[in-house]
Structure formats: C-alpha cells, structure tokens
C-alpha cells in the first residue's frame, strides 16, 4: 500500500455521512449497498446470463441421494442459499450445501442444522497481510455482517493459512473471502479454497 492514498482511511462511515450531509450530498442518506457496485440495480441472474451460458443440471438431496429438481446453472447458487431454489415441495428448509462442477449437480439438504452445512476449518489462500501481527487466536468473518467467529490460525506459508473453528460454522463457502481481526484491527484477508 505504499503508492495508494485513502483520503477517508482515518474516519468511520457515520462521520463520512455527517460530512456528506453538511455539504448537501445525496449520498449522505443513501442506503448502504450489499450488492455488486459495478452492476448497479440490475438482476444478478440476468447480469450473469449476459456473459455466461446457462448450463442446467439436476438438484440432489445429499442425504437421500434422490433427485429433487433441476437447476438453471451452478453459477446462480451459493452455499447456504435457501431462497430461489425453485425445486417445489416443502423447500422452506432446504439449503444449498454443495456443487459438483464436473457432474453439474447442485446438492441440497433439509434443515438449518444439517451436518452438510457445517464446517470446522478452512484453507485460506491468496493472503493479503495488512499487519505484521500473526496471532494464533483471533476473530474471523466469512460473510458480510456476520458476527465475529473465534478461530485458531495455523500459518502454513506466506500465502496460505488454516483457520480452525471447532464450534462449527454454517455455509463457509470456497471462493469467498475470509477476513481476520485482532480486536478491532483487520490483520489479513484471503480466499477460502476448501472447507473441512
């Protein structure tokens, strides 16, 4: 970060909003965004379909191994998702628990506490260290607005760590981010490669 300048780096969002309000900027009262900023207020599935071809396949209940429906393309589903599965029947408590990219199968499981939703450790790669600190115990976030998760960290090399959370965490998803904090300080971030 030697050649990067963050003009708002020392102040928090409430103060930024206050300053924006004082200058009469419309962003002062704009709702926070949790989507992908560069696609705007468009339908995410529609956006993806403009660039990637749909590849329909089957949906399988991972517990019974039975086909329970069809999907429109694995790219549209995330681990832990329960809405928008469109597989009919009593799907209020059906959750996406896995994807087989080679066979084009979407796996679902019944119940919020299903063992297939839980993992207990994750291999994190592409590490971006934001601090010289390398604690063995700290807090992690695997999703936006998720409560802090107490974790143990094993530093494998300069680019890989193993994050352990013996209490189990739902829907930790390969391809998404893991961010570690020591108290209020963000110490590193990386990409979830695999969960165990």
Language-model segments: what does each one mean?
Residues 1-187, 191-196:
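Nucleotide-activated chemistry modules centered on ATP-dependent adenylation/adenylyltransferase
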């Amino acid at each position: 970060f030697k050649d990067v300048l963050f003009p708002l780096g020392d102040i928090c969002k409430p103060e930024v909003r206050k300053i924006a309000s004082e200058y009469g900027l419309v962003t002062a009262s704009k709702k926070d965004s949790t989507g992908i900023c560069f696609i705007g207020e468009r339908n995410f599935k529609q956006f993806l379909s403009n660039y990637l071809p749909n590849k329909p396949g089957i949906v399988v209940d991972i517990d019974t191994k039975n086909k329970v429906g069809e999907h429109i393309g694995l790219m549209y589903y995330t681990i832990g998702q329960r809405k928008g599965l469109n597989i009919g029947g009593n799907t209020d408590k059906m959750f996406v628990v896995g994807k087989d990219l080679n066979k084009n199968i979407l796996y679902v499981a019944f119940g919020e506490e299903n063992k297939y939703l839980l993992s207990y450790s994750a291999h994190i790669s592409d590490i971006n260290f934001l601090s010289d600190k390398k604690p063995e115990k700290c807090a992690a976030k695997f999703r936006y607005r998720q409560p802090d998760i107490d974790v143990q960290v094993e530093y494998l090399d300069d680019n890989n760590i193993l994050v352990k959370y013996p209490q189990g965490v739902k829907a930790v998803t390969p391809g998404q981010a893991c961010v570690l904090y020591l108290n209020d300080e963000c110490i590193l971030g990386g990409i979830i490669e695999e969960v165990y």
